[in-house]
Amino acid sequence: MIFIKVKVKLKNKDNYFSSKELETIETFIGFLQKNLPLEKDVSVAFEKERNKHMTTGVRLPKHHIHVLAKDRLLIDVLRTLSHEWVHEFQHQKMGVKDTDKIQPIGGPEENMANVLSGIFLKKFIRDFPNHQPVLFGELD
């Protein structure tokens, strides 16, 4: 198996996360890249409030992902990140274009993102049990 190294730029991370949470985020991104590899660099911005285009996250053109972070458990933030990562994969590897009309509820792209993000989170919890307290906000 060949692994492609991509850069993932994290924006606003210091506003919301402890060093242990950042370590978990970085481990999770490595896990995502191993399981659903992207070929192009991506930017992930953690936001304090929703913008008009997102529920808890959104994938934007030019490989940008925005994730609502404020007042959420890390496990919820990572599920959103995983969901949007799948959408980025759909654009980078499956031929989905920014101009394509995507069905926001129940469409194939959205269903794929929902299913895979749940699977990835459960596998991450299983494979990295040492991160579980961080994911669930159970730090001392």
What are these regions (language model features)?
Residues I75-R79, H91-K122, R126-P129, P133:
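Post-HEXXH active-site segment of zinc metalloproteases
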Residues H64-R72:
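Conserved interaction-surface patches within small, structured recognition/assembly domains
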Residues I2-H63, I125, P133-E138:
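Auxiliary, metal-adjacent structural segments of Zn-dependent hydrolase domains
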Residues F17, R72-L74:
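Short acidic, S/G/P-rich loop/turn micro-motifs used as interaction or catalytic elements
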Residues T56-G57, A69-K70, L78-T80:
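Short histidine-centered beta-strand/loop micro-motifs
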Residues K13, A69-K70, K101, I105:
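Short amphipathic alpha-helical segments at helix-loop
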Residues S82, V86, Q90:
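Short active-site segment of divalent metal-dependent hydrolases/proteases
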